[in-house]
Amino acid sequence: MLTLNMNLNYQIDNYCLNISFLSLFISMICYWLVIAFPKKIFFLKFAHFEVSLANILLVYLLAYRWLKYSYFPLSNLYESLLFLSWSLTTIQLILEFKFKHKLIGAIASPISTLTLAFSSFFLPKYMQEVSPLIPALKSNWLLMHVSVILISYAMLLIGSLLSILFLLLSRNNKLNYTKNNNLTTASNSNDTLILKNEDKLNLLNTIDNLSYRIIGLGFPFLTIGIISGAVWANEAWGSYWSWDPKETWALITWIIFAIYLHTRINKSWQGKKSAIVAGFGFVVVWICYLGVNFLGKGLHSYGWFL
């Protein structure tokens, strides 16, 4: 009977994961179709439905593990990937509701889709199984520290991806735009480009502002996550900071986005220069979250691949 229940639970989890991935994949296609065909509002509504469905299923998967095993499911890489996928979809839905812009979904849906695909199809099965908590994780700080860090990663990833999109769309122009009658001029390295259609300028400004706002929201979460991690480390290991690879790269991530926010204050650095910093931050976040796990070194052993 116990084996039967375990198999049934595994099948339900597997179905939920597959449906979640399929929903996110469909939503990604729909968002891209909306970008290609702006008047087809049906695709946008269907994309919202699919993201919401995936979000609900991820809530079920996390809640089921929480209730069944009596601790919040953030004890290993697989569970953290599920939580990151949920964070990405939740933040996407909130931002879309607040800012009413389809670009957010077009940028966020590929990340959440790939994150969930990695957790479901690429991680070994033994890493997806539930195991007893190691002593260092038997703390109330588990929920506080890890959840806040992952939520910050979700915001920073979405915001920095928007900056990368900004760089791609503005790669032929500088952002020293001035208006002259009904035309918009942009300084180019060789000449002055006359933009008869102001839509591109408005789009660039929208992307730039969205990126700044989202990263501005994620940075305080990252700060709180690092501080709470230091307090927890002192309780668990007797030291606030040990220059563990994960700690070191978390600090590097914080510095990169602190530099980004500082560049936004300086007008000469706004636009492409600050977007380059944010784009670099996108890579650094993934190194901090996944890259250091390949090292197999440090105190954060529960996240290793090796």
Curated annotation (Swiss-Prot):
Picking any one GO biological process from the record gives: cytochrome complex assembly
Carries keyword Chloroplast?
yes
Primary location class? plastid
Q: Which GO terms describe its cellular component?
A: chloroplast thylakoid membrane; plasma membrane
Keywords associated with the record: Chloroplast, Cytochrome c-type biogenesis, Membrane, Plastid, Thylakoid, Transmembrane, Transmembrane helix
**UniProt cross-references to Pfam families, sorted A to Z:** Cytochrom_C_asm
Q: List the transmembrane segments.
A: 17-37, 41-61, 77-97, 103-123, 148-168, 214-234, 241-261, 275-295
**Gene Ontology molecular function, alphabetical:** heme binding
Q: Where in the cell is it found?
A: Plastid, Chloroplast thylakoid membrane
The membrane-topology field of this record reads: Multi-pass membrane protein
Instruction: Please give the subunit comment from the record.
Output: May interact with Ccs1.
The UniProt family comment states: Belongs to the CcmF/CycK/Ccl1/NrfE/CcsA family.
What HAMAP family has UniProt attached to this entry?
A: CytC_CcsA
Other remarks on this protein: Although originally identified as Cyanidium caldarium, these sequences derive from Galdieria sulphuraria.
Q: What does this protein do?
A: Required during biogenesis of c-type cytochromes (cytochrome c6 and cytochrome f) at the step of heme attachment.
Its protein name is Cytochrome c biogenesis protein CcsA
Q: Which organism is it from?
A: Galdieria sulphuraria (Red alga)
